[in-house]
């Protein structure tokens, strides 16, 4: 039986809770060291939908194949996203005041709830990143990966066979310069 923690990615599973927590803590330490030295951080938001644990209302990062009945799925509001990100951003800048953050919205389509809900989710993320950029001018920037793929590269050759993910050709257009 594999042990896992609901607030972690599924790759952090182990035969015992102690071993699982050891892997998680080791990775947290490495990530913390990296972020203290980084000059830039790119954050890509994929969807405004989250899963909340019914027992306590907590948002979980991974359902770990637990029964669906244990969770409520909801789309966060723009304000909820902004308010959730502010403490994290302030904590990052407390550790690394020079850190510049670049937000993007993933062009990968989430069709689970249909095209309309996907667009509402992406619009929510776009409004949230815009609000954060306005709240922290000079510290947060936005790269329009979503807009480039949806508007400039809307030809189907820029999509993979599943018509949801970008094709390898589109990545050449979406890659940031390395300066």
Q: For each predicted feature, which ranges?
A:
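Short, solvent-exposed beta-strand-terminating loops
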Residues: 45-56
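Short amphipathic alpha-helices and their capping/turn segments at secondary-structure boundaries
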Residues: 24-42, 87-94
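Extracellular serine-dependent O-acyl
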Residues: 100-102, 123-155
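Histidine-centered active-site loop/cap adjacent to the catalytic His
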Residues: 160-174
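Conserved small/polar residues in nucleotide/adenosyl-binding loops
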Residues: 1-7, 172-178
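A solvent-exposed, charged loop/short amphipathic helix patch at secondary-structure junctions
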Residues: 55-78
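Active-site segments of SGNH/GDSL-like serine hydrolases
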Residues: 90-119, 152
């Amino acid at each position: 039986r594999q042990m896992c923690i609901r607030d972690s990615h599924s790759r952090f599973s182990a035969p015992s809770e102690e071993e699982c927590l050891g892997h998680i803590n080791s990775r947290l330490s490495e990530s913390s060291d990296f972020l203290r030295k980084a000059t830039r951080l790119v954050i890509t938001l994929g969807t405004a939908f989250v899963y909340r644990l019914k027992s306590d209302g907590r948002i979980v990062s991974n359902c770990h194949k637990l029964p669906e009945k244990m969770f409520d799925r909801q789309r966060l509001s723009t304000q909820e996203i902004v308010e959730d990100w502010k403490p994290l951003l302030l904590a990052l800048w407390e550790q690394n005041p020079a850190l510049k953050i670049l937000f993007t919205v993933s062009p990968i389509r989430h069709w689970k709830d249909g095209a309309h809900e996907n667009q509402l989710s992406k619009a929510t993320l776009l409004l949230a990143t815009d609000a954060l950029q306005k709240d922290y001018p000079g510290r947060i920037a936005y790269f329009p990966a979503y807009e480039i793929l949806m508007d400039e590269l809307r030809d189907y050759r820029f999509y993979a066979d599943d018509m949801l993910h970008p094709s390898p050709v589109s990545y050449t257009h979406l890659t940031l310069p390395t300066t």
